[in-house]
């Protein structure tokens, strides 16, 4: 008798995606982050759901409702901190996942890659709106500063900002709509992630060598299920270490002060995972120019397939490109550091140089390095 998992309409889908899926035999731990992102998303949806049961999206009570969750709700503190630090783990996995795609040339799967970029934008938007909800000082001023950037759009900018705010400043209407969007977006992300997976399974996974692996495939279960479980254990361990020992390590102390429109904090900055983009935004003295650079810093991922000039897909056998890649990583770390510093000398010039380097490495140095490597192959 044929196995039910291969015939049942629903189980067949799960079977083809997670059990009998043919997978390359040599994919490394860098391929674990997809499943870890799935776990992060499920964790965020669950903790978020329980937080939403006790949260009130109103300017007068939002801050107190978060305090109430932490003090009075059974295990509310752990749910709140798992949600806040879960976002950090989510972005760590996201950056690793995108970095893996860049290093091993996974962006040649165009549909999968482009949906991935949309997922990145959607996740960043969701995290930004979530940061506004506790209605602390940094929530309010972060929302004010970032939404205000849209006013740089010529002609429609000011009207657009007031439309998003639902008034003439960040207020009740803004908080309510941000809560609504923050609640619905993770489900849209989950749907997009399934489409992401659908397109990936059309082509099959890439592997570290970048060479087609059709001749050497192994079943996903048990080999990669057990590998994913190990990754999941390490993820949850790291998350719980953060939550239980240093829950406020990655947060901003200013957010423990209720939002006050009359008092601006000395240093307005977003959560750590946006600092690199924030540094690029601040490094350009012109408002519209800064906004464009901010958007392009992420949107540049879309043109990665066009910038691929190498004859090889992966960077595994390309030492010059490897150097460029790790310089880019160092540059992003530098930008992250600068984004958290005040706007003064020497941070301004470091930020400007790091921003120029970022675009220079991606748009010029990496394609040139690939061409040099192509020519070296002829020798």
From Swiss-Prot:
Its cofactor is heme b. The cytochrome bc1 complex contains 11 subunits: 3 respiratory subunits (MT-CYB, CYC1 and UQCRFS1), 2 core proteins (UQCRC1 and UQCRC2) and 6 low-molecular weight proteins (UQCRH/QCR6, UQCRB/QCR7, UQCRQ/QCR8, UQCR10/QCR9, UQCR11/QCR10 and a cleavage product of UQCRFS1). This cytochrome bc1 complex then forms a dimer. Keywords: Electron transport, Heme, Iron, Membrane, Metal-binding, Mitochondrion, Mitochondrion inner membrane, Respiratory chain, Transmembrane, Transmembrane helix, Transport, Ubiquinone. One of its GO terms (molecular function) is metal ion binding. Binds 2 heme b groups non-covalently. This is Cytochrome b. Heme 1 (or BL or b562) is low-potential and absorbs at about 562 nm, and heme 2 (or BH or b566) is high-potential and absorbs at about 566 nm. InterPro entries: Cyt_b/b6_C (IPR005798), Cyt_b/b6_C_sf (IPR036150), Cyt_b/b6_N (IPR005797), Cytb/b6-like_sf (IPR027387), Cytochrome_b (IPR030689), Cytochrome_b_C_euk/bac (IPR048260), Cytochrome_b_N_euk/bac (IPR048259), Di-haem_cyt_TM (IPR016174). The keyword Thylakoid does not apply.
